[in-house]
């Protein structure tokens, strides 16, 4: 299980701790990942995803998982999220 968000691709970054004396030591900045269950209205199913807190706020802001995935750039999504996006697009095409 990698330390990256399945929806936004946000991952581990590296940097420095900087002391008062300006000494620099290497450190990692980890994303705030949460295991959440999101519901797809189009598919009528629940999906368990590992997403960052920022991505969770973005999903809520866009109006749900379906709207987020349809608007998201496919290159940033994980393989699971890409498959989910394709299923939603297919289901929307059938309904139209």
Curated annotation (Swiss-Prot):
InterPro entries: Ribosomal_bL28, Ribosomal_bL28/bL31-like_sf, Ribosomal_bL28_bact-type, Ribosomal_bL28_sf. The keyword Cell membrane does not apply. GO terms for biological process: translation. GO terms for cellular component: cytosolic large ribosomal subunit. Gene3D superfamilies: Ribosomal protein L28/L24. The keyword Ribosomal protein applies. Residues 1-24 are annotated as: Disordered. GO terms for molecular function: structural constituent of ribosome. Keywords: Ribonucleoprotein, Ribosomal protein. Pfam families: Ribosomal_L28. NCBIfam families: L28. Belongs to the bacterial ribosomal protein bL28 family. This is Large ribosomal subunit protein bL28. It comes from Sinorhizobium fredii (strain NBRC 101917 / NGR234). The lineage of its organism: Bacteria, Pseudomonadati, Pseudomonadota, Alphaproteobacteria, Hyphomicrobiales.
């Amino acid at each position: 299980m990698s330390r990256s968000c399945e929806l936004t691709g946000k991952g581990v970054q590296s940097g420095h701790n900087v002391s008062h004396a300006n000494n620099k030591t290497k450190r990692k900045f980890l994303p705030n990942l949460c295991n959440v269950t999101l519901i797809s209205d189009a598919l009528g199913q629940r999906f368990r995803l590992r997403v960052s807190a920022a991505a969770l706020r973005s999903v809520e802001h866009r109006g749900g998982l379906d709207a987020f995935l349809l608007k998201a750039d496919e290159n940033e999504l994980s393989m699971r999220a890409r498959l989910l996006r394709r299923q939603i697009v297919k289901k929307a095409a059938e309904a139209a």
